């Protein structure tokens, strides 16, 4: 043993064991780092300070604190909630497989309430409303709600229509103080995107059914001209 070789054999075995234990205790954080460095990402002190600032800003924001930290105990909370689900599809391939990774889903079975929370970073938190439109975040949230509907029906054996639904985007500025704002996305804006999701998935399913990917569906079904 290398530790044995480094010490005089004249030392009592109990003494050497005690010193070894003291060394392990002294360097336990260092040892733990090397044990986990391949499976866990180690962040810098600068990144740690940044995350602490963002957390503090969230805790000091009334609504962000409510949905991230000070929520009622009746909620069960799922962070980075991965759902493998299926979209109903009448084709030779059957239902279309989908995947969703939701930042945060809060389910309160006692009060029949489901809260979907999406966290975004932005260069300008004050103009984030424009980002919602530019990047069509409501379409993304509609896709997430499809996943939640499937989860309720197939995993929980419950009807989501019996629950009230709330959707929030927490926007965090990516510089200069990391300010936080929370946006309540009303159901009407999400429901307006349901048909967009349905059309997109049906189109993808058609291409998969027919193994045709170079052009849009209308190209193959028509004369090759595409409508604007």
Name each model-derived stretch:
Residues 7, 12-13, 17, 50, ...:
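Low-complexity, compositionally biased segments
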Residues 47-56, 111, 187-192:
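Short alpha-helical interface patches
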Residues 53, 74, 110, 121-122, ...:
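Residue-identity detector for threonine
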Residues 76-138:
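Non-catalytic protein-protein interaction segments used by genome-maintenance enzymes to assemble
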